[in-house]
């Protein structure tokens, strides 16, 4: 009986650790798969895996860069939003902080509206309705993440690829599909044009 009581006390902690691990696992699978050139529709289940696990631990806090990526990927997969919008909403409702960029993505996903935004990610504020503005902003993308855990991972064995899902999502909302975007470093062009 004592062992069962001990297990019941530890189970929620272990379960939360499991969900956090699974979020990271699915993120890695998605990024590695994309870096290897896998079909973006075949990567969609990994996105769903991120969401289904993240919603279980979102009340503990969602790191800012993870939140931006999760909502940006939602925009990039918006043609399939009926398959994930409930999970994304559950995550959003548990978050204790947000940003104008995340709000921008949410309004687009939930209300099919485009509203002005301001983000703490200054490079995002540089994006207008032109390729040139995106190219300029993208030049700041990597260095703007110098405080991210993955920054400089290309020098370690933990590297999975760097992808600016948020820049691509903003381009999708603004209707910027210029073919020159595929030549920008870190820009996930295949995710941007998958619906075309």
Report the location of each language-model feature.
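Eukaryote-skewed repeat-based solenoidal scaffolds used as protein-protein interaction platforms
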Residues: 1-155, 159
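Alpha-helical oligomerization segments
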Residues: 132-196
């Amino acid at each position: 009986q004592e062992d069962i009581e001990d297990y019941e006390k530890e189970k929620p902690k272990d379960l939360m650790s499991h969900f956090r691990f699974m979020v990271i696992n699915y993120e890695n699978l998605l990024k590695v798969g994309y870096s290897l050139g896998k079909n973006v529709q075949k990567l969609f289940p990994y996105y769903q895996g991120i969401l289904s696990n993240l919603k279980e631990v979102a009340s503990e806090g969602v790191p800012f860069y993870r939140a931006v990526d999760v909502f940006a990927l939602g925009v990039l997969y918006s043609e399939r939003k009926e398959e994930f919008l409930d999970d994304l909403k559950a995550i959003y409702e548990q978050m204790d902080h947000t940003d104008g960029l995340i709000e921008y993505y949410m309004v687009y996903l939930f209300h099919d509206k485009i509203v002005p935004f301001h983000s703490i990610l200054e490079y995002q504020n540089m994006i207008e309705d032109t390729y040139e503005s995106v190219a300029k902003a993208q030049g700041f993308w990597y260095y703007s993440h110098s405080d991210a855990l993955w920054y400089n991972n290309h020098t370690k064995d933990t590297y999975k690829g760097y992808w600016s899902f948020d820049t691509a999502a903003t381009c999708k909302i603004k209707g910027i599909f210029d073919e020159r975007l595929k030549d920008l470093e870190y820009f996930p062009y295949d995710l941007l044009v998958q619906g075309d």
